[in-house]
Amino acid sequence: MNHLKTFILLAGLTALFVGAGYMIGGPTGMLVALVLAVGMNLFSYWNADKIVLRMYGAVEVDASHPEPRVRAYVADVEDLARRAGLPRPRITVIDSQQPNAFATGRDPDHAAVAASTGLLGLLDRDEIRGVMAHELAHVKNRDTLTMTVTATIAGAISALANFAFFFGGSRDDDERPGGLVGTIALAILAPIAAMLVQMAISRSREYEADRIGAQIAGDGLALARALEKIEAYARGGAVNVEAERNPATAHLFIINPLSGRGRDSLFSTHPATRNRVEALLRLGVSQATRGRSGTAVPTGATGKSGPWG
């Protein structure tokens, strides 16, 4: 059901983009918008992981790294990938005091995970395993591709809306579908609608990744502790400069890296940490009654995406 919801939201976002093209240029504008959407998504499909890793200065690491904590991080990601039935991803570290992590890549065979130096320094080993299991859950669910496509289309809608606002008046009202009022409405409402859809997709995928990540690691309580520590640090700790410069990538991180974090609202990239922790605590109690299994997660594992289980 969660995958169906994501598909419907993505289809709606694409329709909004094509509709914006129609409002600006009629049938020709609609066709151009459709071609642009396909082109942008193809580019994102092949290059998004490289762009994001380069943007954050991610450095690939392996078991020969001189720091014991980094070697443990590499070993744990490799172990978690095996448990999840995934190929070994590229394992990277980003030099940032803010504790955070993300995953990227178009599919499990081309995936990469990144952890900040701040995260490796703040959390204990079980908590780091919980965080990286969450990121591998995103890889398993192909969320990295979904969110890349979503961000690309949402950004294009905003660009089209700005174009309509500044240049839409150059055409006669009779030639412009919707007229001047329609163009103004497009410029105001389209970016808001696109943002709402983008945020709804992102939040639903975070809940799902928490659930499957807890299954991969066999310890939902460790992930809950990690989220609480990261959130507490983020409220008063170092600013993620690169994320502030590129807010469109905020949804990639396990915790919203931006300084203007809010509650679990329509305009938030992530669910409220409190809600995520409560769901994980319930799941952790359930896991504890069965014992820590540490078993592999079946391919295509699915479930409800919210804190209600």
Curated annotation (Swiss-Prot):
GO terms for cellular component: plasma membrane. Binds 1 zinc ion per subunit. One of its GO terms (molecular function) is zinc ion binding. Keywords: Cell inner membrane, Cell membrane, Hydrolase, Membrane, Metal-binding, Metalloprotease, Protease, Transmembrane, Transmembrane helix, Zinc. It is found in: Cell inner membrane. It is a multi-pass membrane protein. It holds the Pfam family Peptidase_M48. The chain crosses the membrane at residues 7-27, 28-48, 149-169, 177-197. The active site is at residue 135. Zn(2+) binds at residues 134, 138, 206. Its main location: membrane. This is Protease HtpX homolog. It comes from Caulobacter sp. (strain K31).
